[in-house]
């Protein structure tokens, strides 16, 4: 009994041709870790560089590992990162559906087709999945491999539980080409007859990938180098169906250090974690793009890229075989640069929730505080501790008033505060320029360095040795009344 080929011919007719088509195919099992984000980014860049199509496919066949809400995380992360997809579950496309659990019937049909063509067989052996996963399965001992097809189909029709396994050649070799690692040849005898369709009718990850990549017209498959060992079996599936093999791009892992891969289980950060730690999305993307890829040609020395620049510069030949080490200090360096180069209003908007963590008083201007911070913070999470003195003057050490460079000690500081207080009280122009001009003129009148006057005033108003901005900016933001109150507290603290 041969299969009716109408369905398969219709599926083949839907396959788009003529353009580069890439796919990001995550499983909704949690947050987007750095390696996954890099895969998504490289996949998007390959498509955009070639003027091709970027597809989002949700791989949810492993029902036991699914986490509620994880699909929303995928959509949100891609949107925040600007990795727009041309086809996918939410936008549709010519080869829908784009969720694997909705394609169950397709996998079953193609598994049956492969059985008919001799590339797979029904297996009725009661082997546990854990035994198969651990490599204990020995195809040489599997009596089902050589069952006549009519007999096997009769047992299926009788309701006997089964899986469908790939029939790997017992002899010879299989060679596949990877764009990064070149040609790799393996002995067929080292490959197992992997399960393609499980007892519950759902496909395994490896089988669903091959079917979907072909039917969606995927030209370039980007994934981690841990899948190199599975590539020969993918190739044999393509050959058994008579399909063209896509370009493989296996990327080396992102490492925590020279010995350990990054892993959520070991506390390594996901994209969401990095954002919570105060890193900006553009900085994360720029840094992740360079984790294992180097620009070439006229951009070879370039470090900082916009997304359009990355799309223009990206080429597969620049991807390294060597593992990339995730360096949080280097990411911090990138982030600081991005913060400094933001438009002031954009930085103020990004900084506001972090400013308001410690500055609850709405009278204090977010934009004015942000202006002090932009050149002085590396991450957004640096902000709360830097500006907490605006809401409440901390209980500071009198030793703060002593500064050799400014030529101040407790006695000099007391004198400066006592003398500047009436000047502050009399000042009508409480603007940055007004405060600045008054203090500079008064220091000249006193015959002291500017810093000799500014240092004790800043300490009295902020109660910190290190502040974003100097005395003038801090006094302006605090306002006249609060500045005078804090100067009086400083005089009292110094024994005046």
Residue positions per predicted region:
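Non-catalytic terminal extensions that flank enzyme cores
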Residues: 1-31, 49-54, 154, 161, ...
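Glycine-rich phosphate/pyrophosphate-binding loops
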Residues: 48-62, 207-220, 241-255, 468-473, ...
């Amino acid at each position: 009994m041969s299969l009716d080929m109408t369905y398969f011919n219709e599926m083949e007719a839907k396959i788009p041709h003529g353009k580069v088509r890439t796919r990001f195919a995550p499983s909704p099992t949690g947050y987007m870790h750095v390696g996954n984000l890099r895969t998504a980014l490289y996949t998007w860049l390959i498509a955009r560089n070639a003027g091709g199509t970027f597809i989002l496919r949700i791989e949810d066949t492993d029902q036991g590992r699914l986490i509620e809400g994880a699909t929303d995380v995928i959509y949100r992360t891609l949107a925040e990162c600007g990795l727009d997809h041309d086809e996918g579950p939410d936008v549709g496309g010519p080869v829908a559906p784009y969720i694997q659990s909705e394609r169950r019937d397709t996998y079953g049909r193609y598994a049956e087709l492969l059985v008919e063509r001799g590339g797979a067989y029904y297996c009725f052996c009661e082997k546990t999945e854990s035994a198969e996963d651990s490599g204990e399965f020995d195809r040489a001992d599997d009596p089902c491999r050589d069952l006549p097809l009519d007999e096997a189909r009769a047992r299926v029709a009788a309701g006997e539980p089964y899986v469908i396994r790939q029939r790997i050649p017992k002899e010879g070799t299989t060679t596949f080409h990877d764009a990064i690692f070149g040609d790799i040849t393996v002995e067929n005898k080292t490959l197992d007859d992997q399960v393609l369709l499980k007892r519950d009718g759902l496909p395994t990850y490896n089988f669903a990938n091959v079917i979907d990549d072909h039917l969606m017209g995927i030209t370039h498959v980007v994934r981690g180098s841990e899948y190199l060992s599975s590539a020969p079996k993918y190739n044999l599936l393509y050959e058994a169906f008579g399909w063209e093999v896509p370009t493989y791009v296996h990327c080396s892992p992102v490492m925590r250090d020279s010995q350990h891969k990054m892993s959520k289980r070991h506390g390594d950060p996901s994209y969401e974690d990095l954002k919570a730690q105060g890193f900006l999305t553009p900085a994360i993307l720029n840094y992740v793009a360079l984790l294992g890829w180097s620009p070439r040609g006229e951009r070879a020395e370039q470090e900082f890229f916009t997304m359009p620049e990355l799309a223009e510069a990206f080429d597969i030949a620049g991807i390294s075989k060597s593992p990339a080490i995730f360096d949080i200090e280097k990411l911090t360096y990138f982030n600081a640069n991005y913060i400094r180069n933001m438009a002031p209003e954009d930085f103020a908007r990004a900084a506001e929730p972090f400013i308001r963590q410690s500055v609850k008083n709405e009278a204090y201007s977010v934009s004015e505080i942000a202006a002090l911070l932009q050149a002085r913070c590396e991450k957004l999470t640096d902000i709360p501790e830097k500006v907490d003195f605006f809401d409440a003057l901390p209980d500071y050490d009198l030793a703060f008033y002593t500064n050799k460079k400014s030529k101040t000690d407790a006695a000099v500081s007391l004198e400066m505060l006592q003398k500047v207080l009436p000047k502050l009280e009399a000042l009508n122009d409480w603007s940055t320029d007004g405060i600045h001009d008054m203090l500079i003129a008064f220091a000249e009148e006193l015959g002291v360095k500017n810093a000799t006057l500014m240092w004790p005033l800043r300490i009295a108003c902020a109660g910190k040795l290190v502040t974003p901005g100097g005395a003038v900016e801090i006094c302006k933001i605090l306002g006249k009344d609060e500045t005078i109150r804090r100067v009086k507290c400083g005089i009292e603290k110094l024994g005046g």
